[in-house]
């Protein structure tokens, strides 16, 4: 099915939906914290073969990583190689809701960041304490010296702008901003968020490959009705277990806090993704009151299903979403970290010498893309 992927300076609703209809999550093309894909060339082969166009979570830092100069240079080199394979690829980077003191404190603030906020440049690194959200424990994200940034604080605004700008310079044309409601706890009218997003968009209008950047976040409730900040919404799937059918799940409207909630008045296209967030204390046991799927996060659950059921489920969820939401799309799992197991990540690649650990879901994804 031929689709239009052309844009420059702005993006039409049609082209945006075309990209989202070909979205995958593929971590590690750039740095994924301090690791990266060890099957890079086969990953690019797979993405091209599938017909993927929007490559989600291609680069990000959650907590610790290599120094930023090295990380951004690495991303720039790899994304340039990706654009040799397909110049229409959109690579997405993430600036998340977790900050880690040692990483933040060794990251210099470039002069252009001060200037973007009307400040005199200083020779210093970012300040963890000047951007953290008050009232949280020092291990809020499950490891010491982590915190949530507070978007009402200028230092946090500079941090988000800086990271987005550097990823844009590296070749990214999409930025995911994480749990914006949590980061914006003290910004109920999203005044500070809008200021930061406006700065990112102005930077992209000059420096991005096609003079535009797609911006999304994990949005909740009323924010999904807002049409001023984000290009599209994104959220985990929120799988509902079938208790009498081990390891099987379905989608259901208004289940927990899922995106599938017509009362939220979705005014923009959206993606649902196979999220990663760990596993429960009772893996393999259903609990309909939790966000886990049979005790696992969504991508780990998917990776543990057999090949036939994975094929069945990808087709099922694609049809279920498309039948109910004309502008709703499933972000196909391509490469994402797992909770436990012998391998750090799930890979959809067809198993071969180039990717001996692949789950061989590549052709299923290609088939889904080919009919939607």
Regions found by a protein language model. Give the residues of each.
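Glycan-processing catalytic domains of CAZymes
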Residues: 1-372
